């Protein structure tokens, strides 16, 4: 019985710590986007964006991204919300920014996109693990092609890179380090410390 009580108390303390940490992030208008991008993470990030906008539609929001990617639709939900809210949003790449995460990175305007010195980036065509009858595979293949074209067009528009080059680059995994990402147009600058990122 004592063990259960202690466990419940530990859970309560952890919840309180998490709530305090979340409040700290809300106050400083910082969002950590880490791990696989899925519906659950998308809903969490969207809620935080809407909440921060309700607190101030003029103060900037900073999203730190470290993600191997995941569901493209969940990524586009975050992308659209970043574009939807009035508050200016900065995206900062750290660690790995891959696949759907790179799309979220591009939601901020180019001058508001940064990368940390050791960050690296992966852009590629959407992947499919579909199995089933031939007609289902054919339908899915058509949707996948639409998604591929949409992503290539978005990358081209946001980086200033020719769409044909983007299509060629993303036909296979295209890895870029921080310096190469600046040259490609994914980010505008390498942020070595906090003062490299504007506060307003």
Curated annotation (Swiss-Prot):
**Which compartments is it annotated to reside in?**
Cytoplasm
Which reactions are catalysed by this chain?
Hydrolysis of proteins to small peptides in the presence of ATP and magnesium. alpha-casein is the usual test substrate. In the absence of ATP, only oligopeptides shorter than five residues are hydrolyzed (such as succinyl-Leu-Tyr-|-NHMec, and Leu-Tyr-Leu-|-Tyr-Trp, in which cleavage of the -Tyr-|-Leu- and -Tyr-|-Trp bonds also occurs)
Q: Where does it primarily localize?
A: cytoplasm
**Keyword Glycosyltransferase included in the entry's annotation:** no
| Keywords, sorted A to Z | Cytoplasm, Hydrolase, Protease, Serine protease
A single Gene Ontology CC term? cytoplasm
GO MF, one annotated term: ATP-dependent peptidase activity
Q: What does the record give as EC number?
A: 3.4.21.92
**UniProt keyword Cell division, yes or no:** no
Functional note? Cleaves peptides in various proteins in a process that requires ATP hydrolysis. Has a chymotrypsin-like activity. Plays a major role in the degradation of misfolded proteins.
Member of which family?
A: Belongs to the peptidase S14 family.
* Quaternary structure, from the entry: Fourteen ClpP subunits assemble into 2 heptameric rings which stack back to back to give a disk-like structure with a central cavity, resembling the structure of eukaryotic proteasomes.
Q: What is this protein called?
A: ATP-dependent Clp protease proteolytic subunit 2
Species of provenance? Treponema denticola (strain ATCC 35405 / DSM 14222 / CIP 103919 / JCM 8153 / KCTC 15104)
Gene behind the chain:
clpP2
């Amino acid at each position: 019985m004592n063990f259960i009580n202690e466990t419940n108390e530990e859970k309560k303390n952890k919840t309180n710590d998490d709530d305090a940490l979340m409040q700290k992030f809300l106050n400083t208008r910082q969002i950590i986007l880490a791990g696989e991008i899925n519906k659950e993470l998308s809903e969490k990030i969207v809620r935080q964006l809407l909440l921060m906008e309700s607190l101030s539609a003029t103060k900037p929001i900073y999203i730190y991204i470290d993600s191997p990617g995941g569901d493209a639709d969940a990524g586009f939900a975050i992308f659209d919300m970043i574009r939807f809210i009035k508050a200016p949003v900065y995206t900062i790449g750290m660690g790995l920014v891959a696949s759907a995460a790179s799309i979220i990175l591009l939601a901020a305007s180019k001058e508001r996109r940064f990368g940390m010195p050791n960050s690296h980036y992966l852009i590629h065509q959407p992947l499919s693990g579909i199995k089933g009858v031939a007609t289902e595979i054919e339908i899915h293949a058509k949707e996948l092609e639409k998604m591929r074209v949409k992503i290539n067009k978005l990358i081209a528009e946001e980086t200033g890179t020719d769409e044909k080059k983007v299509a060629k680059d993303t036909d296979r995994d295209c890895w870029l380090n921080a310096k190469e990402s600046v040259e490609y147009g994914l980010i505008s600058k390498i942020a070595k410390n906090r003062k490299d990122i504007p506060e307003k």
